[in-house]
Each structure stands twice: as C-alpha cells, then as structure tokens.
C-alpha cells in the first residue's frame, strides 16, 4: 500500500490510486489484465498493464534481467503522464526498501536479486528509471527517489 500513499502525494485521482494498489497484481498473481479490466475498467487495467513485466519463456530471470529492465525503462519513457505517476509510487517504494536494506546489510543485499552484476546493474536500472520519470521532477516523490538513489549508489 506504500505505492498508493506515494501516488496520493502527487494526485487525488482515484483511478491512479487504484492502479497503484493493483500495480503488481498481474505480475505476482494469477489475475489477468482482462480480469482487472472487467472489474475496474479500461483505464485502471491499462495503467496496471503498463507496470507489468513479462518473463520470457525458456530464459532464466538472470539471463533476461538486463533486457527486461531496458524494455521497462523504454516503456516508461514513452508512457503517459498518468502511467508515470503510478510507476513513481512503485519505484519509490522499491527504492525505499533497497536503501533501508542496504543500510542494514550492505552489499549482501544485491545477492537477493537476479541482476548478474549486482549493485552496478541496479544502479544502471534505477538511473534509467529516474531519467524516464524526469517529468515528475517537481514532485517530492521524485526528489526523494533521486536522493535515495544517490545515497545508495554513491557509497
């Protein structure tokens, strides 16, 4: 629900808040985009779909990590303003968790992920996300995101 709280600092739009609440549903459960569309409508389903990443069949998460993240950065760069707001909630929530865990356990953190080059891959990914979300640079959420990015990766 942290993503919803973050999005609420940017907009009161109830559909964006709903999309933020549902942003990982397609990726992490058996619920489909079509089911979300039937229950919540086109706009929310489209916003959730914009945040969903598909794993390629027959390739490990580690082998496909960089290409998946590059595709996500590219999609986000081309996404609508509303989709970027929903993504900001998700990405800042993730960055908060990374920064918090990095403070606690240091470089051991990077072994939890599928990025083949650990911390350097994550830095590349999060800097790409920051560039893709730059139109939100006037928001406190974006400013916190960049602050945490610098704090975490410039150590």
Q: Where do the PLM segments sit?
A:
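Active-site helical microenvironments for divalent-metal-assisted chemistry
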Residues: 1-155
């Amino acid at each position: 629900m942290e993503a919803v709280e973050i999005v609420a600092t940017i907009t009161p739009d109830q559909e964006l808040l709903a999309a933020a609440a549902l942003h990982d549903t397609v990726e992490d459960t058996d619920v489909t985009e079509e089911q979300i569309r039937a229950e919540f409508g086109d706009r929310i389903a489209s916003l959730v779909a914009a945040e969903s990443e598909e794993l390629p069949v027959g390739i490990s998460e580690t082998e496909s990590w960089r290409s998946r993240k590059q595709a996500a950065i590219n999609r986000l760069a081309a996404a609508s303003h509303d989709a970027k707001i929903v993504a900001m909630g998700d990405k800042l929530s993730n960055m908060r968790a990374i920064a918090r865990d990095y403070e606690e356990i240091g470089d051991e953190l990077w072994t939890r992920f599928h990025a083949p080059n650990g911390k350097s891959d994550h830095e590349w990914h999060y800097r790409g996300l920051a560039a893709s979300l730059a139109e939100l640079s006037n928001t406190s959420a974006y400013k916190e995101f960049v602050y945490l990015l610098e704090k975490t990766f410039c150590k």
